[in-house]
Amino acid sequence: MNMSSSSRKLSRLFNIVTQNQKSPVLLSSDQEAARRITACLVEKSTIGKLQSNPSLLFNLNSNVTRLVLSEPTLPTQSCIDFFKLLREFESNLKPDLTAVVTLSHRLYSNRRFNEMRSLLNSVVNDGFYKRPVEELGSAMVDCDISEEKFEFFEKFFDLVFRVYVDNGMFEEGLRVFDYMVKKGLSIDERSCIVFLVAAKKRRRIDLCLEIFRRMVDSGVKITVYSLTIVVEGLCRRGEVEKSKKLIKEFSVKGIKPEAYTYNTIINAYVKQRDFSGVEGVLKVMKKDGVVYNKVTYTLLMELSVKNGKMSDAEKLFDEMRERGIESDVHVYTSLISWNCRKGNMKRAFLLFDELTEKGLSPSSYTYGALIDGVCKVGEMGAAEILMNEMQSKGVNITQVVFNTLIDGYCRKGMVDEASMIYDVMEQKGFQADVFTCNTIASCFNRLKRYDEAKQWLFRMMEGGVKLSTVSYTNLIDVYCKEGNVEEAKRLFVEMSSKGVQPNAITYNVMIYAYCKQGKIKEARKLRANMEANGMDPDSYTYTSLIHGECIADNVDEAMRLFSEMGLKGLDQNSVTYTVMISGLSKAGKSDEAFGLYDEMKRKGYTIDNKVYTALIGSMHSPET
């Protein structure tokens, strides 16, 4: 039987005795009670001995518990077991603050610091740490531990401080810090760094600054590491100039920043695409003799790529190697990814080969970048080879990689292959996300396989995936193409009621459907609604409306819209011209139609048979 189940059994037994024993056996003194309990605990079966004599526990109180835990003849492990046993009870037998301090002191004396920290962590939910920190100091006195034992005091409060931080109790941690300063206890900078790191992870930059200020004011040793954490926190918050001032302030005090300190500021500037800001930092680094490290080079390469200077990124990569700084998988993956985005697949594969020749193992991100690159250029065979290689080498295929493959197949119109990849993804335990379903449904839609497109979107809803704007637009488009504009309209209204807002594409789909059916009034209303919601009609919107007005024989209104497009700087493409020429020709306005035909030729548009047929027809149509 394990310790926990034995403790629970004893707890139940004690409760039974409590209810049924009218006159428990009370011993003459706390010392006698402690001696009797200690005698039980030195036996091999600690819990078993107490189970045979549970009435002993009636004599327990705070002082007896303290005497037992501080008894030098009792093995420390027995003390730990006894403490754990008492924590199982739901009565006043539970260990109090003096018990925690006593056992902590014992563990400290035995140099069992990890167990001491575990003990303090284990009682975090027992309510002790919600009390004022001064009560911890009072408990020391109650346990006959004098403040002269500075070493224990410092270790104890240092661990309590860390426990607060581990459990996200930052305000309480600050109070412990202040108490230690007040009592003249030295504070370990490493513990303060633990606080800084934890607060930064939770994006509590205010707390980082607060503890750092206390560290400076109380004379805690400040190192470049703690300074860098605060600098990074400020940069995350967008306060780059403040972080630079902090670096300057501590440089004067002899805390010289390292490359990784400056990297945090460079990273902030890179995200802002602030090239001059980066140049300023590099000048300071050069002046102070701070040498670039791997991260510095990687950030500078990233900035070069963002500024469209891939050749500069390659030069930095070469410079890094010339200086003997070894590139890791992250550096290679970044370069491979950037080259893939630029369509430089040959260079990307050369870098991949170089990576493997150096004995580095490509990560899922490395393969993902290459797969994304080959998918974008339509080389799905290469994508399959890379995926198979990932599997053979035991590299995890992430959902991002699966989605990339699905997107690649759908771009090529290979929707059945995309569906098979989806099945493999499901077998691997991945849940379909909105991107996956939208990609496949859109492909079915483009291929005019409308029933399958709808099935995918319905399947998405049944699987609990919330429809996005793209999902609704897809479904609305399918119904419009099937001629079911009423159902499309119902979905259009439904999406807004469910908090999914239509975008310009959604409006364009509905406007086109109404125009095609000759419902020009409804199309006009949608345009007005679109503009009221802050969306400007684009070339597609205008072309649809022009087509609708022409169908409704409102060719003058269509021409007005055509002119309005030009005034707004919208692209009057070949489709727009063809629609307008057809409308004018049908209305017998051959001069205007031929005028637009001449414009088309001047702009270099390809003129198809529809235009010629319309122009010929215009010469035989009476002008309206």
UniProtKB/Swiss-Prot annotation:
Intrachain disulfide bonds: none
Keywords, in A-Z order: Repeat
Repeat in keyword set: yes
Ranges for the PPR repeats: 153-187, 188-222, 223-257, 258-292, 293-327, 328-362, 363-397, 398-432, 433-467, 468-502, 503-537, 538-572, 573-607
InterPro entries registered for this protein in UniProt: Pentatricopeptide_rpt, PROP1-like_PPR_dom, TPR-like_helical_dom_sf
Assigned protein family: Belongs to the PPR family. P subfamily.
Protein's name in the database: Pentatricopeptide repeat-containing protein At2g32630
Organism name: Arabidopsis thaliana
